[in-house]
Amino acid sequence: GERTIATGYTRDETPVRTSEGPDIATYAVNEFPLEVSQRSFWQSHKEAPRVLTEAVFNFAEVKSGDHLLDLYGGVGLFTSQFLEHIGESGRIDLVEGSKSATGDAHRNFAEHTNVGIHTGDVEKILPRFSKADVIILDPPREGAGKNVVQSMVLLKPRAIVYVACDPAALARATFNAKL
């Protein structure tokens, strides 16, 4: 038989692990299928995507016609859950630094003309936007950083929902938002 072996990489493309399995796995979150390649990030706990999206949804208060920014958006977990709520007149722009993840996102949202996928550093891409109604961000453990937080505040969104795995990073972001 044929086996697929892939090497996992850090954000700077340093190889850190080798794994065996399909090149692309498909996960359904609330019935929306998401393709995730081996080089892209995905939550390891099987219930985490559903629990996270429900929590974010409860805080975001997204409305039809909203422009939503999904920062550090990966393969599009949050984007997938807000599509039906923004309607055809709304828009979601997903920004992610991983080329593998944005490649997956392009496949996941190929038929959705109101979703933009942007590959690159969030800090550099965020200033290109002139407004956003809602911003969702799920940055890496070190947090979003002062410049990203201040750029978000300048967009004057109705809501910012920050998913943080490190309380200290969230505290820094909150402090920077008040400056």
Task: Label every model-predicted segment.
Residues 1-137, 142, 147-150, 156:
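Accessory RNA-recognition modules of RNA-modification enzymes
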Residues 150-154, 158-179:
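C-terminal substrate-binding/active-site "lid" region of AdoMet-derived donor-dependent transferases
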